[in-house]
Amino acid sequence: MVNRKLSIVWDEEAFNNFQSAYQYIKKESLQSAKKVKREIIIAVRKIAIHPLSHPPDKFKIHNTGRYRAFEIHSYRIAYKISEKEILILRFRHVKREPLNY
């Protein structure tokens, strides 16, 4: 793995789920929604610099270590590490049924 900042690319469905979560939280509190959104964005930016900082994704079948995941504010973010980018594959609430992939 090269020691440089990788670009972040969101899968369309993952990004839509992130936006939906923001809108859902915003119904109750704009301030809370902004805080959660900001902290998630910061966490995602950090993996561009330190992609191996989170454990391998336990829901990825035959994971070679390139698929990783972490939880923040009750949301689970799964991503794939490639040579040039981090692909955000999934964004879901932790109470939703996990899917193997």
Task: Identify the residue ranges that each predicted region occupies.
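Enriched for short, Lys/Arg-rich terminal
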Residues: 1, 72-76, 80-101
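Arg/Lys-rich, positively charged N-terminal/basic patches that mediate binding to nucleic acids
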Residues: 1-39
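Structural signal for well-ordered, non-membrane alpha-helices
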Residues: 22, 41-48
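Short, flexible helix/strand-to-coil boundary loops that buttress conserved ligand/catalytic motifs
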Residues: 22, 51, 92
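Solvent-exposed interaction patches of small proteins and small membrane subunits
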Residues: 28, 34-38, 55-63, 99-100
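Generic structural signal for secondary-structure transition and capping sites
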Residues: 30, 45, 49-53, 75, ...
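Hydrophobic alpha-helical segments of small multi-pass membrane proteins
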Residues: 39-42, 68
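Basic/aromatic recognition patch in beta-strand/loop cores that engages polyanionic ligands
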Residues: 50, 54-84
